[in-house]
Amino acid sequence: MADFQSFTQEITGLGYVSSDNVFLFTHQQGPDVVFVPMGTMDHNIDSERYTIIIHEDVWKLRTHAVINRLKALTGQTRRVHGRACKIKRIDQKTAADFLENYHTGGYINTYYKYGIYFEQDLLAVALFAKCRTFQTT
């Protein structure tokens, strides 16, 4: 928990209050961030602002992805215009590596995999399943 508190205070400038082991971090321009330790319920969280709930297990497993997401939501990342980007088909390893490093949900196997590139940097991936035909009766 201490590493989460120090990150939010030093990097994003979020202040926090604690209640029943649930920590609420507030930011003037960004969303409220709620850190929920393992074994704690989050269903009683009431906020009038946009709220992000971060569970302790996600923080421990995918810290880098959570940090990047919080930085993006608090305006600490560089914006790139979509017209300056290129879309290319990517392989399974590239998609899996990117999602394991930068996405809190990780990777799932799909049929179509595309990368969004700015210059030589992979900024995002888009994954799509094969088209399915449903029979109606």
List where the protein language model places each region.
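Hydrophobic/aromatic beta-strand patches that form the interior of the parallel beta-sheet core
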Residues: 34, 52-54, 114
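A conserved beta-strand-loop-helix scaffold within acyl/acetyltransferase catalytic domains
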Residues: 65-137
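Catalytic cores of nucleic-acid endonucleases
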Residues: 40-65
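Interaction modules related to DNA damage response and DNA replication/repair
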Residues: 19-26
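Acidic-basic catalytic patches of nuclease active cores, encompassing PD-(D/E)XK
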Residues: 1-19
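Short aromatic/hydrophobic-glycine micro-motifs
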Residues: 13-16, 49-50, 104
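Short beta-strand-loop-alpha-helix junction that forms the active-site gateway
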Residues: 26-44, 131-133
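Generic structural motif
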Residues: 14-18, 35, 87-88
